[in-house]
C-alpha cells in the first residue's frame, strides 16, 4: 500500500470516529423518556471518552504530515458512520450506537493491520486501544439493551 492510500484510510477512520462522537453527543443532548437518566449518562460516558481520542487521533495524523479532516462536508464524505437527523427512542439510540461501535471496532482492527504493515507501531498501538474502547462501548450498550 502506498503512503497516500494509507493516509486516506486513516482519515476515514478519523472521520468515522468524529461522526460517532457527534452522534453520541446528539443522543446525550436529546434523549427523552422514562429511562432518560440511564441513557443520558451512558451516552455522556461514551461521547466524553471518544472526544478525548479524536484530539489524539488528529495529532497522530499531523505527525504523519497529513491534515485531520475538519470540515463537516469532508468528515461526512469520509465517514462510514451515518448521521442521525431524527430523535429516536432511547433504546433505538443505543441500538444505533451499538451497531456503529461494532463497525468501528472492526474498522480500527483493519486500521491496526494497515499501520503494522506500514511499520507505524505508535499509531498501531493507538488504533488497538481504540478497537478495545469500542468493544467496551459495545458491551455496555448491548448489556443496557437486555
Where are these regions (language model features)?
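Charge-rich, acidic-biased intrinsically disordered regions
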Residues: 37-38, 42-45, 68-85, 123-133
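A structural signal for well-ordered alpha-helices, especially hydrophobic packing surfaces
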Residues: 21, 28, 47, 54, ...
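Acidic/histidine-rich alpha-helical segments that form the ligand environment
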Residues: 9, 55, 59, 76-128
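Conserved alpha-helical segments that form or flank metal/cofactor-binding pockets of metalloenzymes
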Residues: 35-74, 144
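Helix-loop segments that flank and shape redox-cofactor active sites
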Residues: 1-5, 20-45, 107-122
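Disorder-to-helix initiation segments
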Residues: 1-13, 90
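DHp/HisKA dimerization-phosphoacceptor four-helix bundle of two-component histidine kinases
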Residues: 12-15, 45-52, 96-99, 103, ...
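Alpha-helix capping/hinge segments and adjacent helical runs
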Residues: 16, 62-70, 100-103, 107
